[in-house]
Amino acid sequence: MAVVTIRQLLDCGVHFGHPKTRWNPKMKRFIFTERSGIYIIDLQQSLALIDKAYDFVKETVAHGGTILFVGTKKQAQESIAEQAQRVGQPYVNQRWLGGLLTNFQTVHKRLNRLKELDLVDFDDTTRGFTKKELLIQRRERDKLEKSLGGIRNLTKTPSAMWVVDTKKEHLAIDEARKLGIPVIGILDTNCDPDEVQYPIPGNDDAIRSVALLTRIIADAAAEGLIQRHQKPDAEGSAPAEPLADWERELLEQGDAAKAELPVEENDVDAEVSAKNEAKSEDEVAAPVHAPESDDATEAKIEAEATESEKAPVSE
């Protein structure tokens, strides 16, 4: 079942490409026709590639992976932040910092610094900091929040990356290729399809087009999260993270209690069955009185009436 229809793609203007003067010949196989000097993208191919990218993102997240949403152009900033936050995935919608992936250890130190500054009360001057020092720390926090706020919970390099406008985000794609990170991206008619493992031919300049395709990728991540949480319950597998000693002790106590439970139930069942057998024996031993018929009852009443008439009346 398709996750989106061609009508939705048409309504959002996904089929509009760049003018003929701005195109990449490698995108020729994704171009349907040309109208008024503008290339029209083949939405049938886009639809098939959307389904392929959707399945990849869903399986990646279901197996514990993360998707980094990247889109720093104005048309994509709002939708990138909104959809990534909706499904709890990291995102970059401001300037891409060089070495964010290839030099992640240094970036991770800056993330720890950001978390430290989040705990500082900048209005409290009784902690040993002057107003000037607190002002400097506040500015540092704001700067880190703007550049790294979207990836504050990222503890390792992402499993895959969603990119809006692969031509503009060439630095991010270069770092992903060096680390072997798969890239899912919107390919306009001026992009190079060889740079992306999961291309989606479409318009990367229209706000509605970017919002629609980003929402589809976010929906795939959301479905993957649902599968990830349902998988341990269905398969009975152990959690991925190691258990603490007190958690393991509680689980062992619970298992021991469950092991004793069937024995108690068997004893109760045996006692109930014994009582039922004793009750049935008493019922068999007791005499059974057949109910009197209607004729016998009438004869008994007539005999009592006759005896009362024959009895002498005392004066």
From Swiss-Prot:
Gene3D superfamilies assigned: Glucose-6-phosphate isomerase like protein, domain 1, Helix hairpin bin
List, alphabetically, the GO terms of the cellular component aspect.
cytosolic small ribosomal subunit
| GO process terms (BP) | translation
InterPro entries per UniProt: Ribosomal_uS2 (IPR001865), Ribosomal_uS2_bac/mit/plastid (IPR005706), Ribosomal_uS2_CS (IPR018130), Ribosomal_uS2_flav_dom_sf (IPR023591)
Q: Per the record, a Pfam family?
A: Ribosomal_S2
MF-aspect GO terms: structural constituent of ribosome
Tell me the segments the record calls region Disordered: 250-315
Keyword GTP-binding in the entry? The reply is no
Keywords associated with the record? Ribonucleoprotein, Ribosomal protein
Q: Where is the sequence biased in composition, kind Basic and acidic residues?
A: 272-282, 297-315
Concerning HAMAP family, the annotation shows: Ribosomal_uS2_B
Q: Give the family from UniProt.
A: Belongs to the universal ribosomal protein uS2 family.
- Protein name in the entry: Small ribosomal subunit protein uS2
Please name the taxonomic classification of the source: Bacteria, Bacillati, Actinomycetota, Actinomycetes, Micrococcales
